[in-house]
Amino acid sequence: MISSNDFRPGVSIELEGSIWKVVEFLHVKPGKGSAFVRTTLKNVQTGKVLERTFRAGETVPQATIEKRTMQHTYKEGEQFVFMDMETYEEARLNPEQLGDGAKYIKENMEVNVLYWGEQVLNIELPTSVILEVTDTDPGVKGDTATGGSKPAIVETGAQIMVPLFISIGERIKVDTRDGSYLGRE
């Protein structure tokens, strides 16, 4: 059990049979009446966002989420298959479960798979990945003076905005949180 006074961003709680992650919280002490905690919660399974108010000191069950490091071994149809390198257990996830993270996963990449009991919830990607540019417009001499950007398709199929001097075959570093170009590798 966790007290509403101990809520912080990233804390996971069980509410109405689901796992919710605290995104924001605000401890409010009105001049009249008792204090309360106003929270913004995100459902880990569905992504639904909920505003919820708790009395100060109210206790709720804390979710026990286990992180297992797994390797993306292959893609079967639309499903991504991950394997635990210690137990050789497999976990299969749909692109809907992965959200935007599916655009950055390549074979043999290690990720943290989040489990609630035996149920796979989601994955945690590294903050940046190295991807090879497979398609982009060719750079022309003198393009760098304007400091513009152009779209590029990387090996996973994701479209990334890159500087004009990037060409096909180059390896670039991409931020998995927002899909931005971080630099050459």
Curated annotation (Swiss-Prot):
Pfam family, any one: Elong-fact-P_C
Matching PROSITE patterns, A to Z? EFP
- Do you know which CDD domains this protein is assigned to? S1_EF-P_repeat_1 (cd04470), S1_EF-P_repeat_2 (cd05794)
Q: Name one GO molecular function term.
A: translation elongation factor activity
Keywords assigned by UniProt, alphabetized:
Cytoplasm, Elongation factor, Protein biosynthesis
Biological process terms in GO annotation: peptide biosynthetic process
Q: Name one GO cellular component term.
A: cytoplasm
Q: What does this protein do?
A: Involved in peptide bond synthesis. Stimulates efficient translation and peptide-bond synthesis on native or reconstituted 70S ribosomes in vitro. Probably functions indirectly by altering the affinity of the ribosome for aminoacyl-tRNA, thus increasing their reactivity as acceptors for peptidyl transferase.
Family stated for the protein in its record: Belongs to the elongation factor P family.
Descriptive protein name: Elongation factor P
What is the originating organism of this protein? Gloeothece citriformis (strain PCC 7424)
Lineage of origin: Bacteria, Bacillati, Cyanobacteriota, Cyanophyceae, Oscillatoriophycideae
